[in-house]
């Protein structure tokens, strides 16, 4: 090791010389050891100059806060501040008083990559902006683990040298010998290594190179003070202390890499920093004049499998092709990774693979000139492997068709409904037989027109759907069907009539006579969810198709005859007498109908529609088992309800007729030409609004809109102009109608 010259040692303040040098074995060295790597980022926002030969004037140095942070809970806050000093101001770095001394006095062995931390003495005031910092303490050296070969640079303020010593140092740089000094060292790793120390003094900015002393000095064994890093650094009451500072600015995209901070002396842009020591290779850092302030810090730690990201925007910046990271504590395994944000984000293209836990990126060569380090992004939780040449990844480019096979077959098969009396047939694409696929929705135009068929034609059902067939009868046969009179028991009016709603013959099954159901109007059903295929649907229970009903999604019609027959069969399987009339006809000659079995009402008073007697509009008889019956001849409640029921049926018929008439009128309006309604011998004004008049009016409105657009009118003004034009068009139509009414000859000519 080289001895620090006595002149440098004499320049140190007296307040740090409070401990004597004690030589102890190296086994008793106590240090704060950080087992896990501490990723840190550094940046040199402004570059200062250092020269070994120069005049005695002080160099103006800008204020520079430096904070080293860690990703762990115990954060080390290091604030090194160099104030802009005048010629009579002492320049000293500052360090917050958040560290405590621990352990006994032990000798120190200085490792590589050290950060020299000084505190401002009590007499000197450090000005930062409008605030003054007056911390006190002693000088510390923060060291990290690294391999041998890196010298230690001790930067001392040039203003502390007396004038006589400055001249002596400049005249005889190699003969000066300084007594050993006491410097407290903080080691983050605990592995001591012998490193040469190089004394450097501050120089004027006019110097071009940073030269070390020709006679290497040896830093003697000094006293080691171990410190404990607090979780929360204390803030001095004398002024604010920056506890965390990220050196790498994302705006300027500084190329600062590694997990450990490497401190370097202040360097002037455009200058070359050279270090020479016996047995150590020389390293050169060249910083060119560019818009990005900062430089790439290189280390000698051999971690060839880690590549740091250094996107460079300045085309004239020279960087080593392989920039390596720094590992704390000698741990160079790949399980600790660092993610450094890239300024040139488009150079890394992420690849998303469905169902994969790993993240993949595609490396793209940077387009900027002068950048030689490829960008690499690493995941913090995944052990990455060396990336090879990127290959295109194709993930499911073709659509996948998924089918649920009913049987194990190779071909995609379409299963058709299976007939009852035949074996199952599977239609495949290999068969030459063709099948007609009918739509599921009912289409009236596909149904055959029964009125155009000749009399006597038999409509055979589809095979396997049942034995029910239809026969086309002449119109005179339908009119000759027996029609029974409608008997009203509401009063003595003897109202008789027939229904005009039922227009086609009903199909008789299970003993139901079509003339009986067609002889009187039935209340329309209001089914919504039963598809009109349940017994509580009156139309379905009486064997009738729904006609002019208020039901929705009805299947009780010819379009869904297959579903209807299946529902009838299911009902008959449960109850063979389900469709037999509960209210049957009497003997021949009797006008009144009677029960086949009586009702069993308990709370409705037999005045609800679910009472079989009341629904059939007959009175309860002796065979009924009802309780509290009000369905008898002289019951006032029954008379009132029957009148209301009759009125409701009449109202339903009127509404149905009105709907039919309205639909016919609408169809006539759509098919016939322009209506000519006479009003006092002339046409009404709206009859003049023909298709040609409407087109001419629209053209006028569009012309007004274009005119407003050309004049640059506002939206409200344009709307006003269009509405005024529309009013003028309507007035012209009305005037034309008035002239035609006053002159009938012109209308007919």
Curated annotation (Swiss-Prot):
The gene is Lin54. Zn(2+) 4 binds at residues 599, 601, 606, 611. This is Protein lin-54 homolog. The CRC domain mediates DNA-binding. It contains two CXC subdomains (joined by a flexible linker) which are both required for efficient association with target DNA. Each CXC subdomain coordinates three Zn(2+) ions. Keywords: Acetylation, Activator, Cell cycle, DNA-binding, Isopeptide bond, Metal-binding, Nucleus, Phosphoprotein, Repressor, Transcription, Transcription regulation, Ubl conjugation, Zinc. The record marks 574 as: Interaction with DNA. Zn(2+) 5 binds at residues 599, 613, 620, 624. Pfam families: TCR (PF03638). Residues 583-596 are annotated as: Linker. The record marks 536, 610 as: Critical for interaction with target DNA. Component of the DREAM complex, a multiprotein complex that can both act as a transcription activator or repressor depending on the context. In G0 phase, the complex binds to more than 800 promoters and is required for repression of E2F target genes. In S phase, the complex selectively binds to the promoters of G2/M genes whose products are required for mitosis and participates in their cell cycle dependent activation. In the complex, acts as a DNA-binding protein that binds the promoter of CDK1 in a sequence-specific manner. It comes from the Eukaryota. GO terms for biological process: nucleosome organization; regulation of DNA-templated transcription. GO terms for molecular function: metal ion binding; minor groove of adenine-thymine-rich DNA binding; transcription regulatory region nucleic acid binding. PANTHER family: PROTEIN LIN-54 HOMOLOG, TESMIN/TSO1-RELATED. The modification N6-acetyllysine is found at residues 244, 249. There is a cross-link at residues 139, 357, 639, 659, 661 (Glycyl lysine isopeptide (Lys-Gly) (interchain with G-Cter in SUMO2)).
